[in-house]
Structures are given as structure tokens and as C-alpha cells.
Amino acid sequence: MHMRTLRLAGALACASALQMPMKMPRSAAGRAESPRMIGSLFDILGGAGPQLIEPENALPGRKEKMQINDRHRVLGTKMDDVPEGHKVAVFANGCFWGSEKGIWRLPGDGITCTAVGYCAGFTPNPTYQEACSGATGHTEGVRVVYDPAKISFVDILRWFWEAHDPTSGMRQGNDVGTQYRSGFYYFDDDQKQLIEASKAAYEKALGRPITTEIAAAADYDQYGGLWYFAEAYHQQYLASPGARPYCSAQPQGISLPPFDTWAPAALKDAYAPKLGEDFWKQHAPAKGCSVVNSPNEPIVM
């Protein structure tokens, strides 16, 4: 029953994608029906909602890596490169189209490159259709290569929290399934401390429990790695010709409390925010996922 329920949920959430190579033909109205349809099926089958697949039941995957474009569509930087002195952040907060655009637009030249992909799952090199089925364990994610001399990890973290509803479990807006769960994955102890401390502060600000998955990137080495690039047509999708302005993220309109009130004392100097409150007053994520209709170019302050 568990596997049947999970696969039906994934099939409904990605019905069009299983029939076509891209998910752009799905209208927002069509996707809005998915939660109701899935809810009815769960009632019939006696399930409680999407549940993460067990590693031993995940699809086997493949050795071949996904082919992607060499350069970022907007920033022009190399997609699979981490320059010296740069760091990486990987997170998931809903449909990766809008999540990626919000991050690449952050000002100050600190964001060197972004990419969308499948993270925190158990199947090597999954396809979109496989990840969307719920049978790989992945969630739609964003990989950020950034220059810590120009933008703080805390700036990225704040955007992450404020750009979605981190309390919604295995869904984000009209998108339902384990592939839409919220998550942030750390590469060192500093990132771990900052993620956990900011979560506690934002949870208090929201007034309800946060369901965001927090885990070490190294936890997924046994499954081939944390991160796999998505297909080329998903990369910087909202900046591609003919892109449909779809975004299901649910910003709550609530700010992360001031850094000084929640940051671990030992990290306050090294990770002080570089984006000032003037930026957040003008460009903070707004209800309605306004990022989809914003310019493609990075914000200039």
C-alpha cells in the first residue's frame, strides 16, 4: 500500500511530465487540481499523504550524467565549476524554476552560478520523470556557487526561508509530493550551525513548526552524492524563450529576525549579512511569487 500510494501521488503531480519531455505545458490551473485529486486517492487508499521512499525501494538509476549547457543562460558563467575561494550551497524550497531565479538575481556579484537539479535522494543520475514519480527520493533543488567575499551565506539563507512556506511538509503550494519538500543541506559545520539557528528563529517568527529537512551533504555519498543536475531545458528555465511564468512557492511575508538575535556568537563576525535592509525592503520575496515576472538580470542596488 505504501509504494502504491506514493507512486500514484507522484504520477498525479507529474502527469503531464510523464507524457511530455517538459513540464511547461501544464497550466497553473491544471496543477491546482492535483492536491484535491491526490487527497481523494489517499482517502480511498487509506494513506496519510506522500511519504519518502525507502532507499532500498528506490529506482536503480544510471551511471551516465545528465548533459547540461556549458554556460549559465543569464550570468554567462560555467555551470559545473567552483572557482577558487568560492563556496557551494544546496537547498530545496518548491518548484526549482522560481527558486533558482530568485537566487541568481541577488545583487552584488556574489552569486557566481546557479543550477537546478535533484538532491537528497537515493537514485544516481535520475531523470525529471523519475524524480517526479517519487520513486527516487529526490527533491527539486538549487545549487548555488557563491563568493563569500561578496555575499554572505546568511543572505542566501534568509532568501531561502522567506521565499517559501517551510511548514508545509511534502508540498509547496499546488505542487504536492516528496519532490517538493523543503530542505537545506550543509557542507561544513558553520553552515549547519547557521541553518539550525536560523530555523529556530524563523519558526518562532512564523508561530508554527517548520518541516524543512536539514542534513549533511556527506550523508548522501552512499547513494552517489547529494546533487544531480536536472535536464538542460530546466536550467534557468524562467529566462528561456517562451517560458511559462509558473511558480508555486508560498512566501509568508514574514522576515527572518535580525541576524544578531539568533546567530551563534562565534560566527557573528565571519557571517554578518552583506545585503542591507534597504535591499530587503525593496526586494524581499512577496506573496504571490512575484519573482516569475521580474527581470532576468541580477538586481542592481
Question: Positions of the model-derived regions?
Answer:
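Short coil/turn segments at secondary-structure boundaries
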Residues: 5, 28-29, 147-148
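Flexible coil/turn and secondary-structure edge motifs
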Residues: 33-301
